[in-house]
Amino acid sequence: MKFLEKLKQAGNSHNSLLCVGLDPDPKLMPVGMTALEFNREIIAATAPFVCGYKINLAFYEALGKQGWEILSETCKLIPPELLSIADAKRGDIGNTSKAYARAVFDELGCDGVTASPYLGYDSLEPFIEYQDKGIFILCRTSNQGSADFQMLKTEYLGQKRFLYEVVADKSLQWNRYENIGLVVGATQQEELKKLRLSYPKMPFLIPGIGAQGGDLKATVENGTNQSGQLALICASRGILYARSGSEFAQGAAEAAKQMRDAINHYRKRF
């Protein structure tokens, strides 16, 4: 199944654009619980309300030698009809990039990955060549320092363009398999709206809701296409740690349902 088709089916199956981040933080998890146990309960509790999960590889790498095993087992827990996105932000050249692609797609079996365009097309090609997998290219990110480079103006095709605009245009040029999307932060509403109008057929992975302060209503209005689709709206801490202690899973389920329903409320305009 092509990635874009699975993305649409995942959203339709649970009537959801919500993508929950699986970022297990030992400081916030229930005392004595392993990351794998935590993820298992989170997935079981939230799966009815989401279109997929975004797995931030850094949280597993930080767990040491057992981290990869926990990561691998976590990926297996995700229901097959839902998306699994490896938030890896990879970007390297040659055999290194090929190895990264094999690790994410062949070993972990993820449906998609986040990647950095800074090294150019040859650093992304090994991912793009997995024609049934999705590649979300960092474009206009949600962090405070993102403007350091992304808002620089450069000469492009005879015009002065922001660097993030060049990234978006290049991403479209590379999208011959229709498996490329953009990472656009919910904290960047002006650019989110502009990019959606310019690229109505590309999926957007949209972090920055919740702890980073992104506005949910504006994100739905600016980040979805004319059919109210093609957006994966990400939330992590606000879902995972909605409650503490033994009620964490129930709290996550309630928070996920509430956010899914809020997103759908704002989608009613479509």
Curated annotation (Swiss-Prot):
Q: Which pathway does this polypeptide act in?
A: Pyrimidine metabolism; UMP biosynthesis via de novo pathway; UMP from orotate: step 2/2
Which terms does the record give in the GO molecular function aspect? orotidine-5'-phosphate decarboxylase activity
Q: Which GO biological process categories is it annotated with?
A: 'de novo' pyrimidine nucleobase biosynthetic process; 'de novo' UMP biosynthetic process
What enzyme category does the UniProt record give? lyase
- Annotated active site residues, numbered on this chain, are 89
- What are the record keywords, sorted? Decarboxylase, Lyase, Pyrimidine biosynthesis
Q: Which InterPro entries match?
A: Aldolase_TIM, OMPdecase_type-2, OMPdeCOase_dom, RibuloseP-bd_barrel
* The enzyme's E.C. designation: 4.1.1.23
Could you list the residue ranges that cross the membrane?
none
- Record-annotated disulphide pairs: none
Catalyses which reaction(s): orotidine 5'-phosphate + H(+) = UMP + CO2
Q: Enumerate the NCBIfam families for this protein.
A: pyrF_sub2 (TIGR02127)
Q: Which family does it belong to?
A: Belongs to the OMP decarboxylase family. Type 2 subfamily.
Q: Which HAMAP family match?
A: OMPdecase_type2 (MF_01215)
PANTHER family per record? OROTIDINE 5'-PHOSPHATE DECARBOXYLASE
Q: What is this protein called?
A: Orotidine 5'-phosphate decarboxylase
- Protein source organism: Dehalococcoides mccartyi (strain ATCC BAA-2266 / KCTC 15142 / 195)
State the encoding gene.
pyrF
